[in-house]
């Protein structure tokens, strides 16, 4: 829609420029016609007064020529002023048209770059939803593997599940999936989401004391933040006491 609107504006500028050029040409033609008419009138005046007495003829001829010259001069001056105004308008319209054209070209180039970047990102992160949906059953599998048991048969099954879990993690790592480090790390709202807070003056302030749910990066983009329990001193002065 934006490009269509800008194209309409450019078309309007072209139309206005053509109209101004047409007016300019008409004014030039009018000036030529006025000059020709003045010359013809002077010739007619000379023929009209040929047969009159010399003094009267000379006086009238001088007066007529003087008036004719003044009228012609005024008309020419007026036309020259109009031509100058039209030239200025034409120059301004051309400048506006050129600036609009350059602006549209720059915006179109930027639009192509944004569209290309968006397309590349869509391809790059096309598997985001699939991987995110895969993480939940993978974490459930980890909980099953970590379950303590004395049953030898069950332990063999759990060993097989553990090998499967490692293979899945390896595939995810190869695709660019990374686990966000959070335990005992300073709380960072960019990567961590605090579900619980505790106050323990034996531990550093604003530190993650426990991971409630693992967080992951996918090709350096946050796939989901880590849910943590954060140590937050309710009164820092109390520790000094």
Swiss-Prot record:
Gene Ontology biological process: protein folding
Biased composition regions of type Basic and acidic residues, renumbered to the chain: 28-49
An example molecular function term from Gene Ontology annotations: unfolded protein binding
GO cellular component: cytoplasm
Bias-annotated ranges (Low complexity): 50-62
Location of region: Disordered: 28-78
Domain of life per record: Bacteria
Subcellular location as annotated: Cytoplasm
Entry-linked CDD domains: GrpE (cd00446)
Keywords: Chaperone, Cytoplasm, Stress response
Coarse class of the protein's main subcellular location: cytoplasm
Subunit-structure text: Homodimer.
UniProt record similarity statement: Belongs to the GrpE family.
Function: Participates actively in the response to hyperosmotic and heat shock by preventing the aggregation of stress-denatured proteins, in association with DnaK and GrpE. It is the nucleotide exchange factor for DnaK and may function as a thermosensor. Unfolded proteins bind initially to DnaJ; upon interaction with the DnaJ-bound protein, DnaK hydrolyzes its bound ATP, resulting in the formation of a stable complex. GrpE releases ADP from DnaK; ATP binding to DnaK triggers the release of the substrate protein, thus completing the reaction cycle.
PANTHER family, per database record: GRPE PROTEIN (PTHR21237), GRPE PROTEIN HOMOLOG, MITOCHONDRIAL (PTHR21237:SF23)
The protein, known as: Protein GrpE
Organism the protein comes from: Aster yellows witches'-broom phytoplasma (strain AYWB)
